[in-house]
Amino acid sequence: MEQLKEKFEPLFSVLPQVKSPGYRVPFREKLKWTGIILVLYFFLAQIPLYGLSANAVDQFAQFRAVLAGNFGSILTLGIGPIVSASIILQLLVGGKILKLDLSRHEDKAFFQGLQKLLAIVFTFFEALIFVLTGSLAPSAPQFVWVLILQLTIGGILIIFLDEVVSKWGFGSGVGLFIAAGVSQEIIVGAFNPLSAPTQPGVPAGRITGFLYLLFTGQSPDFQYYVLPVLALIAVFLVVVYAESMRVEIPISMGGGKRLSRGAVGKYPLRFIYASNMPVILTSALLLNVQLLANVFQKLGYPILGTVSNGQAVDGLAYLLTAPRSIDALILDPFRVVFYAVVFIGLCVLFAWLWVEISNIGPRHVARQLYQMGMQIPGFRSSRGQFEKILKRYIPTITILGGAFVGLLAFVADLTGSLGGGTGVLLTVGIVYRLYEEIAQEQLMDMHPILRSFLGD
């Protein structure tokens, strides 16, 4: 492991990086940087790819919410390379192939450097695949490398924008870009006043179209106009309720200066313990299956399935394509069941990996609580006792939470939710966590004495 570090660390030193703040970033400054990056993201998403064919079709539209990219712009790749790099490293660390202890500063810094390097490699690799397989067809052969260069630059810009948000803003850039893209898609999908080519004169927005047909005495299609909006509302309510669910472990102060000895409180464990990361990672993994299906078909070996007009029509790639209509339950039940089992299973796997790698597993939480001088009433104060009790709860809620978000995303996709079921699920969770972080930061700015207690 030490030899690997010696080989890679010189590379990390030459990679550009966003400087970490040497002080606690105030609330207003975090808000400023988050706003600036959001404006930059929307601006870059409107810069078109020079040399792209006018007939190019978004073959990965079903993953667009998770990619947080805008097809046809320099941000077409979105956060795909970042998440793909994260998947590879999580599997390597989780499988003990890379023996890193991410609670140690040195190992965590090495992990982050390796992730950035791998994300840049994936940016070029995915740009190459998108262009050479025809997913982003050039208008002329001489524009092939021009397109690859533009996509690579856009992907690298996303990597550094994400780093700015993570260090200077609220939440993470990955979450911010997903929420921004899906929110835009929901607003346009619901209220677009322009008519679609398939229905001249009828507004393309689900709500505007429904009202137009209603007021002109026509009968709106329930499954097309109403069901996606109802599914959107249902997913929103379920996610908000699930985010508020907690398993609370009673704790008390075993001594110390900050609080009086014996003060009793509760340590909350979220039901969705791994947040929405399992869904992001699972969706990104399935996207890579579709990409590889295109590559193998281009090479003349369609081992993952046949791709026609950018869509998998058979094989494993087809089975791992999300069903987007309730009709699929009747027309292709095997595919629906197969996809559901794989999707939910992967969400559980990534939930477990994320908990271990993010240092929120029983061992790390036990050490944190013990170092704060906490104890559980009725038990002796020891790190081992903390870990033993937390092991009763954290693994269980990790598995249940991962399965829950996977099932919810699958069902929401099946109903054709406005903004995409997975996209809505991710956005609601991201915005909810962002709201909590903003509220906490504002509270600490108003009451500085709370900073030490909240661990800042």
UniProtKB/Swiss-Prot annotation:
How does the entry describe its membrane topology?
A: Multi-pass membrane protein
Query: Which Pfam families does this UniProt record tie to the protein?
Result: Plug_translocon, SecY
Q: Which residues lie within the membrane without crossing it?
A: 60-67, 68-79, 80-88
Q: Which UniProt keywords apply?
A: Cell membrane, Membrane, Protein transport, Translocation, Transmembrane, Transmembrane helix, Transport
UniProt keyword Transferase, yes or no: no
Q: Which NCBIfam families match?
A: 3a0501s007 (TIGR00967), PRK08568.1-5 (NF006341)
Role of this protein = The central subunit of the protein translocation channel SecYEG. Consists of two halves formed by TMs 1-5 and 6-10. These two domains form a lateral gate at the front which open onto the bilayer between TMs 2 and 7, and are clamped together by SecE at the back. The channel is closed by both a pore ring composed of hydrophobic SecY resides and a short helix (helix 2A) on the extracellular side of the membrane which forms a plug. The plug probably moves laterally to allow the channel to open. The ring and the pore may move independently.
**What is the protein's given name?**
Protein translocase subunit SecY
